[in-house]
Each structure stands twice: as C-alpha cells, then as structure tokens.
C-alpha cells in the first residue's frame, strides 16, 4: 500500500486500476492522482450496497473515485482455555472488555498479547468501546481513545498485522 501510494504521488505510476485502502483515499483524492469514475462505464455499480457506499463517503465524498472491493471485520482471537485460566471462568470472552480493560490485559500479558499494527482499525474500535462514534471528527474523542490505548500499551508484546496468526495457532500469544 505504501509502495502504491508513493508511485501514485510521484506520477506516471503505470497503474490503470488501483485498490487503495479507504484511509488512503482522502490523500490520493486531494493530491489529484485519481481519475474520477465514469458511472456509464460501471453498469453494475447500481448493485452495490447503499449502506457500504454511505460509509465510504467519509473517505470519498460522493463516491466519485472508488467502489468497494473488499469489506472485512476485525475481531479478537484468543485461546479460551488460557484466558479462563488467567481470568477465571467468568472471563468476558464475548466482549471488547477482554482487551480494553487494563486490569484484564495486564493479567493476560503473561500469555502474550499482540495487537494489529493498523491504527485505522484499532482507533475506531477504541472509540466504539468508549461509546463514541467510530468515525468521530471531534479531537477530544481521539484524545480519549489515545488515553485508553496508552494504558494498554505496557501489556502488548508486539504490534503486527500477520505474525499474530501463526503465534496464536502455536500458542505463543
């Protein structure tokens, strides 16, 4: 994604079509490196989910430069037996409390805790956990999310967006 963005920003990237993540779109649009879509060339655009298009408006006002290609979710992966051994049988295994309550995460750190190296995923989840809009435009909301995440930082072994998959499967986190 960084390589693609760098090539686009430098000009003459050689790309005809790019698949940029939503968080990159505002910078690419502002820089004028994307061509506006031609609706007549996209007859199946009418079949796109209006709810997803509405969510994309925060990164692409008017949905003029992008269409959704992938849509995913972010969840919590953990070893239930390890969690219950550390936190007890009533551990909040179905709640974000499992990782966003420092008293839980401090205990779980002995098992190893990894977090996605993806602020664009983690910060909105923290905002939601705090009862704030995930796409807030209020700087104070982001300060609250930052304060929460800073409380958790000492208990996180590493940030990575792929290593945790193998480590979780092998019992390392």
Report each predicted region and the residues it spans.
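Paired acidic/hydrophobic, glycine-rich loop segments that form the ligand-binding mouth/hinge
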Residues: 16-19, 157-158, 173
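Early extracytoplasmic/lumenal segment of secretory-pathway proteins
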Residues: 1-27, 166
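Extracytoplasmic ligand-binding site segments that recognize negatively charged/polar headgroups
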Residues: 22-155, 160-165, 169
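Short, intrinsically disordered, charge-balanced linker/junction segments flanking boundaries
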Residues: 1, 171-173
């Amino acid at each position: 994604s960084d390589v693609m963005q760098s090539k686009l920003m430098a000009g003459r990237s050689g790309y005809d079509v790019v698949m940029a993540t939503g968080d990159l779109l505002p910078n690419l649009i502002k820089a004028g490196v994307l061509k506006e879509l031609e609706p007549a060339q996209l007859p199946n655009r009418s079949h796109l989910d209006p709810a997803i298009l509405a969510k994309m408006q925060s990164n692409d006002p008017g949905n003029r430069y992008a269409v959704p290609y992938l849509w995913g979710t972010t969840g919590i992966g953990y070893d239930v037996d390890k969690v219950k051994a550390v936190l007890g049988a009533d551990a909040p295994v179905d709640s974000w409390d499992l990782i966003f309550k420092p008293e839980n995460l401090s205990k779980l750190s002995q098992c190893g805790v990894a977090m996605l190296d993806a602020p664009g995923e983690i910060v909105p989840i923290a905002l939601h956990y705090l009862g704030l809009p995930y796409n807030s435009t209020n700087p104070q909301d982001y300060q609250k999310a930052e304060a929460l995440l800073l409380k958790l930082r000492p208990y996180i072994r590493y940030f990575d967006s792929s290593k945790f998959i193998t480590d979780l499967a092998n019992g390392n986190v």
